[in-house]
């Protein structure tokens, strides 16, 4: 195989590989001879089929295989010799593919962008600040009160009392669209908490002020994106009878409440709440610390970036943000989404940090264990209740999906590795100050 360089600009590489016709013919003959002892053909004993007949019968297929193997081997040898690591799969094209015939040399072009050499990052001088929040008694009490509210019961209000937001009303209702009842549009003794927004918009608001015994005609319009297409956008009337109006009664904050939530006592429940709150604060603090570290690394090291990686990342960012702004659109049945300059700037940062962290992780021999991958798959599978097995099979058969799960685990382990060697000071802050620091992350 002859190799000629055609491009070497920045990270872009181009080569022309030529496989002489004689070499290809020799490889085809060698493959046919290797297969000859096992070939059976009518009119011949096993292993006695003439080479000429074998070539006529199998030559084209064998030639295609030999051609592909030769090109693949030449590319592997070239990459090993040059030390290049392609950023993406090299683009391989046959120059004379349309006119090529047996006896001609095989000429292919190979083009790719090489990953850049990553300069050494001096991590010894990295200084970071970890925000520390301790759960206060007020925060624990507030969490307890929320638990008590969630465990609340309802008691009948005095006869004639008007219902207000937060009250529970017990109703019978019958819905009509175009004068006809529809499936799922009626119920009896239905408990509805006003203000819970569990019914379609406008329904609950019209029952505020109703009293037990009142009959109310509730007029609403189903949302355009309503889950039942036959009702979407339709006007509806619900004939509603209010049978009871009940006031919320928060549960007592005592040992009985604690037992409802699996704790042995109120003190034990308080301890669990404190641990949960501080775990949440630590998680949020880590986000701030990680962003600070990534900002430092981004400023610390500069190197050329493969345009193909930046372009792919920018398109992915643009696509993701577009879908976040258009949640009603599913799939990819939309026009081309062009990345903006902001998308490209963010893509450059992500690619640069991704390559740098990969280099640091490789030198530190950081890997993602099978156990860590299994835990990640389990966490993701919980988002698809009833379809866990199908999700597992999808991950097993999809290397790209595996990499999408592995990448953030690897990144976090590399970040932890850097933080362990950095000078980290702790700064006590309030919950509000931590929340402001988190909000600032979203604005960057």
UniProtKB/Swiss-Prot annotation:
**Disulphide bonds in the chain:** none
Keyword Metal-binding among record annotations: no
Which keywords label this protein? Answer: Cell cycle, Cell division, Chaperone, Cytoplasm, Isomerase, Rotamase
Subcellular location field = Cytoplasm
Q: Which family does it belong to?
A: Belongs to the FKBP-type PPIase family. Tig subfamily.
UniProt xrefs under NCBIfam families: tig
Protein name per UniProt: Trigger factor
Give me the gene this protein comes from. Answer: tig
